[in-house]
């Protein structure tokens, strides 16, 4: 691939990630997304290598490869239409307030990569609101740990997972809106025709 074509493709990939981020800003319930921009959006290979990323929260970017690898290792069957959520620091997550959404990209039944969105949630359960207890002595004080699990399977919500996530936080309505914002970001690629 010549340099001009490579730059055009790179710019298109970054633009996709930026557009995903704008979608998060406009649809999230909490101001930590809309004002503080404490989220990021990326494209990754099936192996977890970063293809492209938007620059919303640079601190989250470095975690993408490990997050993808951890998720792929734990989810036995990844199918079109799946959306996987994950925040467990012991499985590559950044910390419990950082929820990551993954959506596989398939072309003719072949896994080509993942659309990834990461966002900092204001409330994740735990001993204090916000997930940053100074008195914490163990991970369970910090909030609900979510190993990689399908939140949406083949395009349909998994109600039991939604119930579990929303029953363990002080602000279920806000968390619902922010989860949907991150999902809307990973869904955007299906609306874009390259």
Residue ranges of predicted features:
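Conserved small/polar residues in nucleotide/adenosyl-binding loops
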Residues: 192-194
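A short, hydrophobic, proline-anchored segment that marks a local hinge/packing element in signaling
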Residues: 100-107, 116
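Regulatory sensory and allosteric helical modules in signal-transduction proteins
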Residues: 46-53, 65, 69-88
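Mobile "lid/hinge" segments at catalytic clefts and subdomain interfaces of large enzymes
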Residues: 111-190
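N-terminal cofactor/phosphate-binding cores enriched in small/glycine residues
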Residues: 18, 22-24, 36-41, 46, ...
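A short, polar/charged loop-to-alpha-helix boundary motif
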Residues: 59-71, 122-131
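Short, small/polar residue-rich loop motifs at catalytic or cofactor-binding pockets
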Residues: 35-38, 97-99
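Short, basic/aromatic recognition patches
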Residues: 12-36, 72-73, 90-92
């Amino acid at each position: 691939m010549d340099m001009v074509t490579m730059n055009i493709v790179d710019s298109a990939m970054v633009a996709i990630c930026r557009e995903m981020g704008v979608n998060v800003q406009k649809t999230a319930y909490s101001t930590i997304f809309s004002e503080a921009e404490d989220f990021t959006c990326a494209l990754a290979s099936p192996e977890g290598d970063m293809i492209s990323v938007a620059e919303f929260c640079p601190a989250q970017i470095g975690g993408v490869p490990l997050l993808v690898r951890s998720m792929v290792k734990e989810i036995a069957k990844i199918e079109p239409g799946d959306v996987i959520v994950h925040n467990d620091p012991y499985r590559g997550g950044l910390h419990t307030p950082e929820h990551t959404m993954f959506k596989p990209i398939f072309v003719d039944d072949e896994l080509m990569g993942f659309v990834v969105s990461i966002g900092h949630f204001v409330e994740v359960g735990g001993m204090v609101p916000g997930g940053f207890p100074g008195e914490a002595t163990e991970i369970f004080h910090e909030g609900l740990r979510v190993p990689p699990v399908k939140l949406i399977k083949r395009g349909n919500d998994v109600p039991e997972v939604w119930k579990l996530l929303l029953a363990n936080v002080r602000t279920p309505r806000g968390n619902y809106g922010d989860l949907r914002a991150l999902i809307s970001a990973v869904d955007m690629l299906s609306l874009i025709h390259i």
